[in-house]
Amino acid sequence: LAPIVYNLMIILGGLLMTDQGDPSAEGFAWGVLAGAILGNFLIQAVGAFREGLRFPSGVPLSSPVLREYLLLALPLMLGQSLVVLDESFARVFGTQLGEGPTSQLGFARQTMLVPIGVVAQAAGVAAYPYLSRLVEEGKLREMTTSLARALRYVIVASLVATAALIALSVPTIRALFERGQFGPADTAAAASALVFYAIGIPFWGVQQLLARGFYARRQMWTPVLVGTAATVLAVPIYIILKELLDIRGIALASTVSIAGYTIALAVIWIDRTGTHVLAGLGQTMGRALIPAVVAGGAAWLVAHAVQDLAAGFTGAVLQVATGGLAAAAVFLGLAGWMGTMKAVSDD
């Protein structure tokens, strides 16, 4: 629940301040604070205390438990992963194109992160304790099977999100951000960046789960070192694609970089554990890709069919709502007919 609550509070903060006539980023900032307190602290604290967590009177520095924790956490503290620095790259390279592109990239990236938070981060957070317990019990085969199943679910959901965001990129950005000085031209630019960002959603989803798999096996250094290397290699990719495609190139560089990072993690995982973690992934992607593409096409057609019924914010919300419902209905129907969900659940 933590990433879902965190992202929802950010969105809610922005909407509340906008309704009060303040189009600045202050509402999003308050949403970050509220989401961090409610999602990342209070929910976790309540759950931990229900499970019997109690604060000891004192923890000596020589405690083996404390030493083990520090050794496990050290790689995460020292590493500069692409996942952490991707936002900074967008801001740094975006400023080279001017103030407008920086905001456009930021809004497009925020929109892309919503389905990642709802699907991938939530799945990763939920799966990690279970995967860790299986490793501690020596059930490595069962752990790998569970991870593979979770990956299949995330891939299916990510493909649907990608198709829907690409099809509804313009009305989505318009509904969320087009007000004040952020006009139609900014919406078009941000929507074009969102298309390239959205292509990377499946890779973000797989990365979130694969990283948890390494963490569950206490191989903390692997995703950190690979992520740090990916960060270094990402810099020339950003430079080249920015020169070629401007704002869209920066978004595409993000997708290319996270794709390379994810593929590298997958190759290392296969080398260490065998190919079972990827069991059925190809079949699942094959059965999910066609329904997702058709669903995206349906969303685009419906959104364009209703675009003249209302203008401005109301019209954009209408397009997103009707297009989203059309995408969901078409995908569920076509996926059921093609046996997509059966391929996901089969081990």
Descriptions of predicted regions:
Residues 1-16, 199, 206-239, 248-251:
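Alpha-helical transmembrane segments of multi-pass membrane transporters/permeases
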Residues 25, 44-83, 271-286:
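Interhelical loop/hinge segments that connect adjacent transmembrane helices in multipass membrane
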Residues 2-15, 22-49, 229-233, 247-268:
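Hydrophobic alpha-helical transmembrane segments
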Residues 301-347:
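Membrane-proximal transmembrane or re-entrant/amphipathic helices at the cytosolic face
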Residues 121-139, 148, 211:
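Helix-loop junctions and terminal segments of transmembrane helices
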Residues 70, 106, 127, 139-168, ...:
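Interfacial transmembrane-helix starts/ends
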Residues 25, 30, 67-72, 94-114, ...:
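Interfacial/gating helices of multi-pass transporter permease domains
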Residues 166-200, 313-314:
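Interfacial segments at transmembrane-helix termini and the short loops linking adjacent helices
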